[in-house]
């Protein structure tokens, strides 16, 4: 998908830069960052991240700076309007999902409820 099209999920420059760096470390240019939602955590749902070299039927792929973010259709329905970012600070370095659909989140921000 093009950067010019309004996307249901934003993939920030900071996140794309970090993914590019991590993929270079793995020496596998086919890898993409997959973000997904699974049951669990203290609020009912939690975010997960993994590298994947497969894009499954129905997955949405967002390309930015030569790297891809992949989301399965089930997870995407909970992430519409959100963003995937990367931050470095006092709490450490991590990918962060900003999700306008979450009614509440836990203190660490890793789990949420809808």
UniProtKB/Swiss-Prot annotation:
Q: Which Pfam families does this entry report, sorted A to Z?
A: Fe-S_biosyn (PF01521)
Q: Which Gene3D superfamilies match?
A: HesB-like domain (2.60.300.12)
**What positions does the entry give for iron-sulfur cluster binding?**
42, 106, 108
* An MF annotation (GO) of this entry: 4 iron, 4 sulfur cluster binding
- Cellular component GO terms, alphabetical: cytosol
Keywords, in A-Z order = Iron, Iron-sulfur, Metal-binding
| Cofactor note text | Binds 1 iron-sulfur cluster per subunit.
Cofactor(s) recorded for this entry are: iron-sulfur cluster
Q: Per the record's keyword annotation, is Iron included, yes or no?
A: yes
* Any single GO BP term: iron-sulfur cluster assembly
Q: List the disulfide bonds.
A: none
PANTHER family under this entry?
IRON-SULFUR CLUSTER ASSEMBLY 2 HOMOLOG, MITOCHONDRIAL
- Give the protein family: Belongs to the HesB/IscA family.
Q: What does this protein do?
A: Required for insertion of 4Fe-4S clusters for at least IspG.
NCBIfam families recorded for this chain? iron-sulfur cluster assembly accessory protein, PRK13623.1
Kindly state the subunit structure of this protein.
Answer: Homodimer.
This protein is called what?
Iron-sulfur cluster insertion protein ErpA
Taxonomic source organism: Salmonella arizonae (strain ATCC BAA-731 / CDC346-86 / RSK2980)
Task: Please state the gene responsible for encoding this protein.
Answer: erpA
């Amino acid at each position: 998908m093009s950067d010019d099209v309004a996307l249901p999920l934003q993939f920030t420059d900071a996140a794309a830069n970090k993914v590019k760096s991590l993929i270079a470390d793995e020496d596998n240019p086919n890898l993409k960052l997959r973000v997904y939602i699974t049951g669990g955590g203290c609020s009912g749902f939690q975010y997960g991240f993994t590298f994947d070299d497969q894009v499954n039927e129905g997955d949405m792929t967002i390309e930015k700076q030569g790297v891809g973010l992949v989301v399965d259709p089930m997870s995407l329905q909970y992430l519409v309007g959100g963003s995937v970012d990367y931050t470095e600070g006092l709490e450490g370095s991590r990918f962060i999902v900003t999700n306008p659909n979450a009614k509440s989140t836990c203190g660490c921000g890793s789990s949420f409820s809808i």
